[in-house]
Amino acid sequence: MFAVQGNQKFPKGLTKDNIQSLYQQWQVMRNQGATEENNPEFAQISSILRMVQRAHYARMQQMRNQSSEFPDAENTNLRKQQDTLPTTGFNNLPEGKAGMQTLPGRPASNGPTPPNPGNGNVGLNNPSYMNSQASPNIMNAPLQRDTSVPPAPSMVHPHTNTNANSNNLKVYANQLSQQNTSNPTYHNAYDMASMMKNGSRMNNSFPPTTPYPPANDTTVNSSLPHSFASPSSTFEQPHTVQSRAPSVDTTSSSHSFSARNIPANVSMQQQMGRRGSIPVNPSTFSASSPPSGSMLASPYNGYQNDAASFAHSKLPSSANPNTPFNSTATVDVGAAGSHFPYPQPSNLDAINAKTYFQSSSNSPAPYVYRNNLPPSATSFQPSSSRSPSVDPNTVKSAQHIPRMSPSPSASALKTQSHVPSAKVPPTSKLNHAQLAMLKSQIVAYNCLNSPNGQVPPAVQQAIFGRVYGASNEVSPSMPFQQNVPQMSSVKKDTPTRDANMRTSKAPYIQNIPNQFQRRAYSATIPVKNESLAKPSVSPMPLQQSTGKTEVAKRAQFPTNVNYSSCVDPRTYVKTPIPFSKFSSSENLSLIPSLLPPSISWDDVFLSSEIAIACSIANRIDFLEKENRPKSVNKKILQQDKSKSMIELRCLRLLEKQRSLRETINSVIPHSDSLAAGNLRLMFRNVKRQTMQEANLVLALAEKQKTEHAMRQKEKLLTHLRSIMLHRKSIVTKVDKQNKAKTQRCKDIINFHAHLEKEEKKRIERSARQRLQALRADDEAAYLQLLDKAKDTRITHLLKQTDQYLENLTRAVRIQQSNIHSGNTSGKGSNSAELEAPISEEDKNLDYFKVAHRIHEEVEQPKIFVGGTLKDYQLKGLEWMLSLYNNNLNGILADEMGLGKTIQTIAFITYLIEKKNQQGPFLIIVPLSTLTNWIMEFEKWAPSVKKIAYKGPPQLRKTLQSQIRSSNFNVLLTTFEYIIKDRPLLSRIKWVHMIIDEGHRIKNTQSKLTSTLSTYYHSQYRLILTGTPLQNNLPELWALLNFVLPKIFNSIKSFDEWFNTPFANTGGQDKIGLNEEEALLIIKRLHKVLRPFLFRRLKKDVEKELPDKVEKVIKCPLSGLQLKLYQQMKKHGMLFVDGEKGKTGIKGLQNTVMQLKKICNHPFIFEDVERAIDPSGTNVDLLWRAAGKFELLDRILPKLFLTGHKTLMFFQMTQIMTIMEDYLRSKNWKYLRLDGSTKSDDRCSLLAQFNDPKSDVYIFMLSTRAGGLGLNLQTADTVIIFDTDWNPHQDLQAQDRAHRIGQTKEVRILRLITEKSIEENILSRAQYKLDLDGKVIQAGKFDNKSTPEEREAFLRSLLEHDGDDDHDLTYGELQDDELNELISRTDEELVLFKKLDKERAATDIYGKGKPLERLLTVNELPDFYKVEVDSFAVQSSSELEDQYLERKRRRRNSISYTELTLDELNTVDDPSSTLMPRKRGRPRKKTNSGSSLSTPLSQESSLARSGRKNTPSYKQKALRRYCMEIFERLYNLQSEDGRFVNGLFLYPPNRKLYPDYYIIIKRPIALGKIKRNIKNDRYGDVGELIADFMLMFNNAYTYNEEHSIVYEDAKLMEKTLKEVIEDLEKNNSLHAYEEEALNEEQASLVFLENSEAELPLDSGIVSAEDDKVITYEDSSSSYSE
């Protein structure tokens, strides 16, 4: 920091030479780009120069104030400018803005300065002096002229003028010296003139500043001392009483600081604070203050001596780096004193304020309007209030100040108006009385500005005519001491006169010895004595003073006013103040008179300097003591000693440095000249060095330097250009060579690409030719093209398929030769012809012709009297007869509804009539179709003797005698009786075995298949099915294996060759086959199946059959369904309401099945239904709780109204029960058929529904029980409520209505829940249908379709192989879309729309209604909204399992199988009641009760019951034997030491692997096998091995080949075989039995010895009962 007094750099203060050197340094640093933000030294120098500039200006204003008047000849222009200044600068200010304000800190009137009751400093900060109306000023120089003092010279600015100002000051000083040389004005004027003369070279080079004083300059701590060094060489501040208010008259333009624009009555003695800034009181800082970093004057080039030109000149911005002031300085809130109230114009059109005003965001406070202040503040404004704004019209009229009239009148005062006055001519000089009064007022003013703040009584008597006490009261000796006016508590809105009028031209009041002029207070302050209040001047209205309405006359002020005293400032404080009004604006005003005395910053600075000096002295004393040899601390390190010694010596250099600075500063003024003392021309005038020349020299040097650099740069650039040109030539040459190489390479690549393209075209052309040959069944052409192509893969594939077909051909021959021919008279061939060897010509025949070598024309039999067969039915009869003639079996796979039953009856009647084959014929049908078969036989072949083998045991016993006598042609029975009464039925040698719905034997391991294949004998076998391929090729092979066991004897080879093209449609092994390979394999498969499979579609044979249109409708989930679905999906369980109101947890098994239930209807769970509808009376909840039911609520009324009969198929009988409740609530008649419906009732239900007069429009059926063999063609609408995993079940259900005899278009509506498990089920079913389409339908097994038709159909399926959606996916449908979907005609569409409008008008549910149609989440109970943590669910699930097992309600079991024999007996027996069948696999019973007992049945009975009769020692041995095998497999490790039993201990998790339990029907694991061993579940080793093999097969089926589980299973299977061989080799089982027998005999001996000691009630059981005898004691247990 640069200090002025006591500073190390300037020990004797700032001299003109110091200032010149600082300015030169400032100029150099500014040219180098230094700013105050990034250069602290530059900021310090700028602050010092700014401070000196303020001092110059303040001294100049002080000299003007000390002069009496301006000379008339020199200052006429100045007064003219003063008079016209307001109209020039502020004529366009808006109303209410601050105009000319009298600065605080000096009196603004001729009245007395009232003493301050608080701190005696009311003249310093009292705002009453700011707000004075129009009182004449005692400092008014034109009115207080002294003839002894010469007029002051006319000056513009001490820095902007040249020698003119200094000469004027010298003349002025000489005039003063002639009168009185002791006049201080003389010395001041002479010093200022000398300073200006010596500093004239700083005329136009002084650093530019802004015309504002800085609010705070934080870079200069010590700005000005009490005085400068000397009157001659330094700038000295006069030794006057401190004034903490800057004395700048803002009644003139605050932006024009020309000396002639400043009134002569303004005291410009400015006291600078210690920090170099003008003290600012934050409570009185006005919004009109200039931005931080501004300065008072702007002495830069172009400055003119008129306010208008300066106002329109552009001032430097506060952010300009070339200005030597701190642009980032903040308001010095710590400084005491008043502030600079600057007016800020708002109308920028007249003065172009944009050029010099900064943003108002820098202002610390907003503008404060006069009318916003409380009434008490308008007359006496405290220091906390903002400077009042000024009205522009008030400023306009303020240039003509009203005068105080010498003869006041109270009535006249009320009518006076503020009228602008004309120019006032200069008055005469001051007389002696006026001069004495002026001197007294000056003394009083200085006393008030002193620290004491008290005016001596003599001065008060001279000024006021009386003496005031300390409490602001008149002394008792004065006659008017009791007439002190008081503030009134009554607030009024009377406007007050503007307190900022210029008073320089007010008339002087004479001859008032005992009175003083006081300022006029607002009318809101009444006085107690009306006589004393009369002389007060009444304030003028604001609108009159502005001059907006009319020009008023000049105000006449009273000449004789009796002022008593100032108002006690305590009257402005209301006591007490309520707490609610404590923070109001009128109670927050600060009264400066009541504030404590202000702080003297000079004393603070002096104290700070003393403290610093004392600190330095104490530190020196401490360091000296520390470095004394005797007091040295041994613990102090040598490094610390060195530091302390260095510090001590630095502190001792302080005085020497100060002395050196003083010496240097005293020498600097003498070394300023360029001339030297020893030169000859030292006394000649030396040219003064100016900054312009220095700048010019620097510019020339810089120019030369720049030119030299440019020449060097040009030389370097020329050299670089030559290098670059050479480089460019080289690069061009190389690029040309590279382009040539590249072109050659491209030509070669293009040549090879062309060759490759031609070869590819040739290969594609060859492939197309092969495909054409393949599609045309031209095998010779295909083989020839294949030889040319040399495709080894296709060749190998073709060879393999040829070999397979050759083997099949040979197998066909064997099959034909093995079947007993019987009587084949007529056109058929004899057995000798069949046994003839195959010739070379026969080898070249078609595979189909080989199978059907014998052909016979057929006609309708005569005994077939029910009607006439159609052409396609005769074709079917011909194909079945061809199989019979060629000793082959087959599959009649016509689509449902084409009359397979009638064709079969016709075939039987043909054999009876034409072939004389009387049977017996065995027809195995489902129970649901048995009645239909009987009816068809009675209709079409009544002469055929038939037996319906069914009913209770008594009825079947009567039928058995007829069977034994063979008095029948056809036996009709069901699958259950085939198994149940196998001993009887298997004894008969059947001629033909016909199985309806033959897909029941698709599993070769099933009990039905094994029973038929093992025990039943027939010459011919025929399968009737509408869906030969339901899931995969192995199921198709199972059917082929059953009818042709000699041909299709290997499932492995069949699946290996023909399942490859379908592996990429969802299987795990994906082998890439091109179109040709897939087509070749599929064609070979069709070629294999065509002789044995006969299939026609309804659309092919029945051209007049109406179409079947299927639509998939996606239904949304209700709020209840959504919550339950999320719970089940996330936690695998449902949350139900507990008994005590808490949320309970209900665990469920088979997550997929539970999700399907939720999608169908949530009320399938009784707990949920009780929670939602406790009373069970809210019928609307039945359809609002489920999306599917809500959709049906909109569809069914429309269908019933238009007469459309509807079939609705369900998977779950519980949903059918809920649907019954819904239909009953709507009073709609319905029929129901499921697995529990009796056989006799089914016929009556069908007849009732098919009756045209019936009023039943809806028939509910279960898919498995009612989807087979029923004729319901009177219905034209089928609704699939929930999709079956097997799509053919749904197709069977659809064909109940879409069949022969249907005359209407059939609409199939499939309901799918949106975004649920049902979408996955549908996609899986669609995949199965695609597989069926490729294998069966594309084969066109109708013996009449052309190869082109079959090829086109297959190709269309292959093209859409990747499609998942097809044309069946629809989103959620609105009413209009739904109407278009279910309507058949336009009339129905109009009717449906009308019904929708009626429902919307009457329904209480829907959009815009209180409740939605679907149940929302907000309507659910609270416990459904609780989010249960999964950890809590998991921990509590184990505790709830046992309780839920006991409390689980009994539900009706859903049976997808036919009724067993016992159930049928019970059904047929009216005296018995049908008991619900238990879940799980039915227990096997012995045939002991049956009269027909075969050895096989006896063996089975003994084998099953022999486990418990097995001796105990054998069971122990077997248990030990099985456990040893188990331990060997359990402890098996792989080659890397890993136990292979990890994934075989327990079955997979149902939640993680739900599809495992769909694919794997019998899961088993090592844990279950171990439990079976311990519980003696195995009767022999074979059962144990069977369980192990089942576990291995499950692993092979579910997992991919070469996977870890697959390989582990192979290793365990291999180990099992080795263990078995090892144990059998050692005969371990026999050895274990002997050991167990010996142990048992030993125990028996022990028991015989201890038998006498046993008590009678020891629990011995007689051995005669063949029971286990058990003896128990405290130590052991023995069993026999």
Curated annotation (Swiss-Prot):
Residues 429-465 form the QLQ domain. Residues 61-135, 203-258, 274-300, 367-427, 477-499, 817-836, 1466-1511 are annotated as: Disordered. GO terms for molecular function: ATP binding; ATP hydrolysis activity; chromatin binding; DNA binding; helicase activity; histone binding; nucleosome array spacer activity. PANTHER family: SNF2/RAD54 HELICASE FAMILY (PTHR10799). This is SWI/SNF chromatin-remodeling complex subunit snf22. Residues 1476-1486 have a biased composition (Basic residues). Residues 118-127, 222-233, 247-258, 282-299, 374-392, 1488-1502 have a biased composition (Low complexity). Residues 1191-1354 form the Helicase C-terminal domain. InterPro entries: Bromodomain, Bromodomain-like_sf, Bromodomain_CS, Gln-Leu-Gln_QLQ, Helicase_ATP-bd, Helicase_C-like, HSA_dom, P-loop_NTPase. Its main location: nucleus. It is found in: Nucleus. It comes from the Eukaryota. Helicase. Component of the SWI/SNF complex, an ATP-dependent chromatin remodeling complex, required for the positive and negative regulation of gene expression of a large number of genes. It changes chromatin structure by altering DNA-histone contacts within a nucleosome, leading eventually to a change in nucleosome position, thus facilitating or repressing binding of gene-specific transcription factors.
